Regions:
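Helix-to-loop junction immediately C-terminal to a conserved catalytic motif
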Residues: 53
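Conserved ABC transporter NBD signature motif
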Residues: 61-72, 82
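Conserved ABC ATPase "signature" region
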Residues: 117-134
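Conserved ABC ATPase signature
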Residues: 138-142, 146
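Catalytic Walker B motif of ABC-type/P-loop ATPase nucleotide-binding domains
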Residues: 163-166
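H-loop/switch region of ABC-family ATPase nucleotide-binding domains
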Residues: 195-196
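Conserved beta-strand-loop-alpha-helix hinge in the C-terminal portion
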Residues: 215-239
Length: 243
């Protein structure tokens, strides 16, 4: 479903120096896999998620989705179907909330992609996410965790095939995090999450992609095998987070 091969990403800073964020990254993700993306701050996790969502494009290497090479040139022709297929929940939910009410947030994607029975779908989605009493509320009045629910509800409502999530538990209390994990298992779609929370990672998925602090792919395999390998954990600088 997703194939990344020899992918590089860099940018030039204000001093004219090249800053490398991803170097020679290769992996494949099959349909309905649940993958945890691990690594210290600055290792390139958020950048990789942005590439998978085509918010930025590789400088070298390839990103292939369903047999289509995803690159800047020609992306406009496939952007509509791609945006319907792949949803991205950013760490800051405010980046996804721009409508007057929670109802309008959930409606937006449904209208954009031509769904039928929009009102019914909004009501069902609101109930699923515990948002019924907030439907007429402006999102900016809500707490961080509630905003996260609204943003996720608006993405799930359009029935994506792939869900990307950057630190999804950052604004959530433990009970809501447990609810989120249950929801993701129930959705049964391809899901990739980045997280620093190794306890959450173990509850979420079996497979891990681990980025090193020099922006390469350090590990691709079973999460339980990575967590048992103290040498790799130390190299990833994640050993202190597990215990």
């Amino acid at each position: 479903m997703i194939e990344v091969e020899n992918l590089y990403f860099d940018y030039t800073d204000f001093k004219g120096e090249k800053i490398e964020l991803l170097k020679d990254i290769s992996f494949k993700i099959e349909s309905k896999e649940r993958v945890v993306l691990l690594g210290v701050n600055g290792s390139g996790k958020s950048t990789l998620l942005k590439i998978l969502n085509a918010l930025v494009f590789p400088k070298r290497g390839s990103y292939i989705y369903k047999g289509m090479r995803i690159r800047k040139r020609g992306f406009k022709k496939i952007s509509r179907s791609f945006r319907k297929d792949i949803s991205f929940l950013m760490q800051d939910p405010n980046m996804l909330l721009f409508n007057a009410t929670v109802r309008e947030e959930i409606e937006f994607g449904l209208r954009e992609f031509g769904f039928d029975d929009i009102e019914k779908r909004v009501e069902e989605t609101a109930k699923r996410f515990g948002l019924e009493k907030y439907l007429e509320t402006p999102p900016f009045y809500l707490s961080g965790g509630e905003k996260q629910r609204v943003a996720l509800a608006s993405l799930v409502a359009i029935e994506p095939e792939v869900l990307l999530m950057d630190e999804p538990s950052a604004n959530l209390d433990p009970p809501t995090t447990e609810w989120l994990m249950d929801l993701l298992r129930e959705l049964d779609i391809t899901t990739v999450i980045s997280t620093h929370n190794l306890a959450l990672a173990q509850k979420f998925g079996d497979r891990a992609l681990v980025l090193s602090d020099n922006h390469t792919l350090l590990f691709d395999g079973l999460l339980k095998e990575f967590l048992k390998n103290e040498e790799l954990m130390g190299e990833a600088k994640l050993l202190h987070r597990y215990g």
